[in-house]
Amino acid sequence: MQTIWPHKHIHTLANFSIQDYKSVFELAHRFDVLKNAGTKKIPALQGTLVTSLFFEASTRTKNSFELAAKRLSADVQTFAPSSSSLTKGETIIDTALTYSAMGADTLVIRHSSSYITFEIAKKLDAINAKTSVLNAGDGLHSHPSQGLLDIYTLIKFFSKKSLSPDVLNSKKILIIGDVNHSRVARSNLWALSAFGADIILCGPKTLIPDEFINFLKTPAPKQKEDPVKSRGSITISRSLEESIKIADAIIVLRLQKERMMENLLSSIDSYSLDYGLTPEKLSLNSKEIPILHPGPINRGIEITSKVVDEYPNCLINNQVANGIPIRMALLYLLQKYNK
């Protein structure tokens, strides 16, 4: 693991180097080993304050981050938008500055505005605040911790002996659904491609525009060059059946029902018929490939209950479990930067 963590803030995986990924995965694995040996809490962040600023509803991410902080012995401060000064007109940035002034070492932020964590970090840095910002999902832009835990889940599945992200090289990873409106998918594209995975995006053109073929050519803000020298590929398919036949793993995205209101789909039923994951469609692949879903699940729409509950390599609960050591690693590494 690298001796110096290079990021004060974590906004996106677009600026992660191979070594950055490996540092996170190696540390997460160490936390996994400790937990499996019966050590559920360690004093690594004792005396530090992690503040959870969630401006959007969340079950998995919010609770996972708070549990991760507690397992590192950090103090956890939870923000409730409905009872905050936001109701009096205070801006999001001023709210973040207030919590920083209270002594927050890390602000874990989720918000509906893309790139908002960049703006908050910029304000904090301008006043020389030591507070780090960790993006827990911003608009359609990015969800770094979800991308990392998804990749970690696949690495654990494919690694036969020692844990190695290199097992993803040349693997065909199928992502099904509403990529265009998914911050999770964007983070997965950066992370999977970094380790040479070949990504197949499958869905209707209204949810996966042809322009996504060039997604990896778009740098992060203020990023001059890609820190990963060679990436895997992106292809787009409109046929789920043909894509499943060649896939080594599948990531299913939640269909946001509001897309019907935007006239992006003719009907939920037709989408489910064409792109819903069923046992019958999975049988087109000769292997029992791993199935991931970031949650929450729309049972019977993008994936059937039979797949979720009975398919042997449905790893949805594994993803939830893996989120804790991954987020422990991120919180720990940010404090390492500040020290």
UniProtKB/Swiss-Prot annotation:
PROSITE patterns per the UniProt record, alphabetical: CARBAMOYLTRANSFERASE
EC number: 2.1.3.2
GO terms classed as biological process: 'de novo' pyrimidine nucleobase biosynthetic process; 'de novo' UMP biosynthetic process; amino acid metabolic process
Molecular function, one GO term: amino acid binding
Residues noted as binding L-aspartate in the record, renumbered to the chain: K88, R183, R254
Listed GO CC annotations: cytosol
Keywords: Pyrimidine biosynthesis, Transferase
Pathway(s) served: Pyrimidine metabolism; UMP biosynthesis via de novo pathway; (S)-dihydroorotate from bicarbonate: step 2/3
SUPFAM superfamilies registered for this protein in UniProt: Aspartate/ornithine carbamoyltransferase
Pfam families: OTCace, OTCace_N
Catalytic activity, reaction form: carbamoyl phosphate + L-aspartate = N-carbamoyl-L-aspartate + phosphate + H(+)
Annotated residues for binding of carbamoyl phosphate: R60, T61, R110, H143, Q146, G295, P296
Biological role: Catalyzes the condensation of carbamoyl phosphate and aspartate to form carbamoyl aspartate and inorganic phosphate, the committed step in the de novo pyrimidine nucleotide biosynthesis pathway.
Subunit structure: Heterododecamer (2C3:3R2) of six catalytic PyrB chains organized as two trimers (C3), and six regulatory PyrI chains organized as three dimers (R2).
Family membership noted in the UniProt record: Belongs to the aspartate/ornithine carbamoyltransferase superfamily. ATCase family.
Protein name (record): Aspartate carbamoyltransferase catalytic subunit
Natural source organism: Prochlorococcus marinus (strain MIT 9312)
